[in-house]
Each structure stands twice: as structure tokens, then as C-alpha cells.
Amino acid sequence: DEGQRPPLLILFLVVLIDMIGFTLVIPFLTYFVQDLAEADGFIDMATRDWWVGIVLASYTLGQFLFTPLLGALSDRVGRRPILMFGLVCNTIFLIAFGLASALWMAIAVRFLAGAGNGNIAVTRAYIGDISTREQLPGRMGMIGASFGLGFMIGPFVGGVLTDPANAFGGPFDTEWWAAHPYFLPCLTAALLSAI
């Protein structure tokens, strides 16, 4: 059991980081979608919320379609390479999302982020691989706790770090940060994934 502690901690952190990346958009997504769609010239207040739903759903659609493939691939090549692939996808696509300049880009990037990240399913399979029958419920509960903690931290990070030019000033008081008010939370989550 002692030899399994490091992988369990790593698996806990993988799920935590995934959930932070998934949920950090919640506080700012409505404004981000509105900004992107207004720049594209095709939104009104009646359809804004519909587009927010599309952006949110695009991530889960990507996961729905590609998690079975990633799970099967993890059976062949091992759990760790697929978990690493998911973290790399998180890093790349969180940065790309924060820099999206059109609504279609935001939708596409969120879809690709979901498609490249089957880490929750692979983590559960990994725990099944390294756990006895008696250990399994507690370890799956640990993953559930990580999931919940990420759901709590993600929106906090997204809300606090949005619009740093106005919120923090100083080094963020530049035209670039003013033009990219949603990039800092995405970058922060991307850096967590990269570590």
C-alpha cells in the first residue's frame, strides 16, 4: 500500500487539475462569448446564452466522442502516456482558448480540449489496476473528492484572475492584457497542467 501512495497522489492531482481547467470558465464565459460574438457581429442578448451553452457543451461532446478511444488506447499503451497526453492537451488548448479571437475558435478549441482529455476515465481505470477490492471504494472516493475540489477551485480562479488589467493593474495594465481579459485564468490552469 505504501508503494501506491505516490501514484494515488498524482492521480488525485491529475483529476484536480482537469476539473480546475474545465470549470474555471464558468465565471467569465458569458462575457467572453458576448465579446467574441459581438466582434463576429452576429449575437444579440436573446442568443448569447445559447452560445454559452454551445461552448460548454463542445468540451463534453469532445469527451463523449473520444474518451472511449482514449480508454481503449490506455489499455494498449498504458495509462501514463494517455494521462500525459491529456495534460498536454489541457495546456495547449487552455492557452488557445484564452487567446481565441472568434466564437468558432472558442468552440473548436473547447471541443479539442475535451477530445484530447480522457483523464478522468483513465484515472479510474488506473486506480482499478492498482487497487484491491477492499481499497477500491476508498480510492474512488478520493477521486470524487478531487473532482469536487477542482469544481470549487476552478470557478474561484476564473473569477479572481479575469480582467487583470482592471483588477490588478501594475504589470497587467497594458493594452495586451486589456484586449485579452480572459487569458490569465486560462494561462494559470495551463501552467498547472504543464507542471
What are the residue ranges of the model-derived segments?
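Residue-level signature of mid-helix packing/kink "hotspots" within the transmembrane helices
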Residues: 56-68, 118, 151-152
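Pair of pore-lining "gating" transmembrane helices in MFS-fold secondary transporters
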Residues: 4-36
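Conserved MFS/SLC helix-loop-helix module at the cytosolic interface between two early adjacent transmembrane helices
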Residues: 64-103
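Glycine-rich segments within core transmembrane alpha-helices of 12-TM secondary carriers
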Residues: 140-166
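Cytoplasmic loop-to-transmembrane helix junctions
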Residues: 48-51, 135-142, 181
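Extracellular/periplasmic helix-loop-helix junction of adjacent transmembrane segments
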Residues: 32-64
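Cytoplasmic helix-loop-helix junction between adjacent transmembrane helices
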Residues: 108-147
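Symmetry-related core transmembrane helices of the 12-TM Major Facilitator Superfamily/SLC fold
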Residues: 179-195
